[in-house]
Amino acid sequence: MNRNIDELRTLMSISANASESEIMEAFDSIANYLKNYCVIKTKDEKYRILDFEFYFFNQNHQDITTHPRNSEALCWYINDFGGIDLNFESKVEVNNEPMVKKGFKTYSCRYKLSSDSYFGGILIRQIQRLSDKVIFDGPLKVAELFRTLNASHQLQDIPILIIDPESLEKLEFASPQRHNILGSHKDITKKVDYNLQSCFEKVDDSERADLINSLQKILDKESTNRCYRYCWAGLKAK
């Protein structure tokens, strides 16, 4: 099959009403691309993606650990923790009316969940520079590629994702669980409440309960049918 970036972009355009099985199938196809065909290219170097995690929310897959965003497919996204995501096509209603604080208008951004909401991205956890095999381990190390961009013009040398299987040796990948998915909360209910309070307009009690139940089901499935994270087998998964 002739692999190309447009096919990957189509795979990254998961709809608001896609079923869970369709989402899992898309994850699997996208993972095959990232493991075996894609590299990140800068002006002077190429980098292989060695560890990545899937995050996606829609009405049939309510993974509320996913950061809300609005984006076309295949855009880079600096997430709330300073790491780099590769975005799915994402659409969610946003209220960015300024807040008045101490007499000044300040920027505020609150997202509104609905049956039409769909958003997400792929967190890049580890990459390897192909020229010397140096590994950048952890989302903040990966973000070093995006640290310094020219402030004087818009034609910047931003890293891009390209199809380049000839640069990649064959590697075996494992599928561990996503790293530290609940963060410091260690509890699904607390994690859901934290994300809702941090990013979203208030939801009613029944919606909150649905989000808690949905996340529990996702994490239960992830523990047995691991298809949310892929890392090369030489990495000791954290």
Task: List each language-model region with its residue ranges.
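A cross-family signal for N-terminal binding/gating loops and helix N-caps
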Residues: M1-K238
